[in-house]
């Protein structure tokens, strides 16, 4: 029998502890090792047993979750999934948690609404199981993502066809500008920071989908903008894709790459979950295959699941140059692995070599 994933739940809310316990125990691969109402009780339990994953509340009496997380990561690193409310102030706190080493985040609004069979409950279980496989050596450098825990079940999984306009069949002229499309999930927030910090101010125009809920992407883009030479912002419908500028897909919206003549711009739309996500990497990549073809470069980074795999294959088939982050540098080698398995990847590189590859490719345009 396979070893179960043992979870320690730390939250000052009895109802959250009870709901999380109920939701997680519906999965036969998960068992609750213990629950604790604050970090001090959790510390005592950690002296007795070590879990595979910890779920950690952000706001608690006596010691907040971020302080406990930092102490834990400096003394005994364990995969941690943060639990937080969906607020703009909370988004800043959660970015600090990801910097401190949290693997992932789930929203309390989804926990409170979840029953054992709901889509939200499925997502919570998926996040915890994924965290148990995280490479902690990479988590400290490329720490996590933020997840809304809002996905469809496998039977309802939709493809990017629901968002893409019909293909025009028109020939695509080569332009002198290159556009870079990036997709990431678990581990992506810090992986993207490391990647973007290495790019100069005249880097190619770039569009990015990082799996995040609404209200978090604006804070994420603002944080990156303060760290990088390129200009980074949350995308707005109709924004042009310009050299030296990076557009981040807004949470809970899909982002498509569009083209008018030699000009690229983004279309930001509402719509159903695609590949179990909104925003979806597949939506961006498949739109890039149609609108940019060989003028594009596709990059798929650390993350669980298969979002982006089909889109990267279509980019590859349309003549784009495609790169996947390697397993050794990924926090979770899911999305890159699926893209490689589909045959849509031209080159596999460690994270610290991807920015250089972008600049080398740019010289060919």
From Swiss-Prot:
SUPFAM superfamilies per UniProt: CheY-like (SSF52172), Methylesterase CheB, C-terminal domain (SSF52738)
Family: Belongs to the CheB family.
PANTHER family, per database record: PROTEIN-GLUTAMATE METHYLESTERASE/PROTEIN-GLUTAMINE GLUTAMINASE (PTHR42872), PROTEIN-GLUTAMATE METHYLESTERASE_PROTEIN-GLUTAMINE GLUTAMINASE (PTHR42872:SF6)
GO biological process: chemotaxis
Catalyzed reaction equations: [protein]-L-glutamate 5-O-methyl ester + H2O = L-glutamyl-[protein] + methanol + H(+); L-glutaminyl-[protein] + H2O = L-glutamyl-[protein] + NH4(+)
Function: Involved in chemotaxis. Part of a chemotaxis signal transduction system that modulates chemotaxis in response to various stimuli. Catalyzes the demethylation of specific methylglutamate residues introduced into the chemoreceptors (methyl-accepting chemotaxis proteins or MCP) by CheR. Also mediates the irreversible deamidation of specific glutamine residues to glutamic acid.
Major localization class: cytoplasm
Coiled coil: none
A GO MF term: phosphorelay response regulator activity
Superkingdom of the source species: Bacteria
Gene: cheB2
Domain CheB-type methylesterase: 173-359
Response regulatory domain boundaries: 6-123
Protein EC: 3.1.1.61, 3.5.1.44
Origin species: Rhizobium johnstonii (strain DSM 114642 / LMG 32736 / 3841) (Rhizobium leguminosarum bv. viciae)
Name of the protein in question: Protein-glutamate methylesterase/protein-glutamine glutaminase 2
Modification note: Phosphorylated by CheA. Phosphorylation of the N-terminal regulatory domain activates the methylesterase activity.
Notes on the domains: Contains a C-terminal catalytic domain, and an N-terminal region which modulates catalytic activity.
């Amino acid at each position: 029998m396979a070893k179960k994933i043992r979870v320690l739940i730390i939250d000052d809310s009895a109802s959250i502890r009870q709901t999380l316990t109920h939701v997680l125990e519906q999965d036969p691969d998960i068992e609750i090792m213990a629950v604790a109402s604050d970090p001090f009780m959790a510390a005592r339990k950690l002296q007795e047993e070590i879990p595979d994953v910890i779920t950690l509340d952000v706001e608690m009496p006596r010691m907040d979750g971020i302080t406990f997380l930092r102490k834990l990561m400096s003394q005994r690193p364990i995969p941690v999934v943060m639990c937080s409310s969906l607020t703009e102030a909370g988004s800043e706190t959660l970015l600090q948690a990801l910097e401190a080493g949290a693997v992932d985040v789930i929203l309390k609004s989804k926990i409170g609404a979840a029953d054992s069979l709901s889509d939200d409950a499925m997502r919570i279980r998926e996040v915890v199981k994924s965290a148990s496989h995280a490479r902690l050596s990479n988590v400290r450098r490329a720490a996590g993502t933020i997840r809304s825990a809002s996905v469809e079940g496998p039977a309802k999984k939709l493809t990017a066809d629901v968002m893409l306009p019909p293909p025009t069949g028109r020939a695509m002229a080569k332009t002198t500008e290159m556009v870079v499309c990036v997709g990431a999930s678990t581990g992506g927030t810090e992986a993207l920071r490391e990647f973007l910090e290495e790019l100069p101010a005249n880097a190619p125009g770039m569009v990015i989908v990082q799996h995040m809920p609404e209200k978090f992407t604006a804070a994420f883009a603002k944080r990156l903008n303060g760290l990088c030479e390129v200009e980074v912002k949350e995308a707005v419908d109709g924004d042009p894709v310009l050299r030296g500028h990076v557009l981040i897909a807004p949470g809970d919206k899909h982002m498509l790459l569009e083209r008018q003549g030699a000009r690229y711009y983004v279309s930001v739309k509402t719509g159903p979950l695609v590949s179990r996500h909104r925003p979806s990497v597949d939506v961006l990549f498949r739109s890039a295959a149609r609108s940019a073809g060989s003028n594009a470069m596709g990059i798929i980074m650390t993350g669980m699941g298969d979002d982006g795999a089909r889109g990267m294959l279509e980019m590859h088939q349309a003549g784009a140059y495609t790169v996947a982050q390697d397993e050794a540098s990924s926090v979770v080698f899911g999305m890159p692995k699926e893209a490689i398995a589909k045959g849509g990847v031209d080159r596999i590189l460690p994270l610290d070599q991807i920015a250089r590859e972008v600049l080398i490719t740019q010289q060919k345009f």
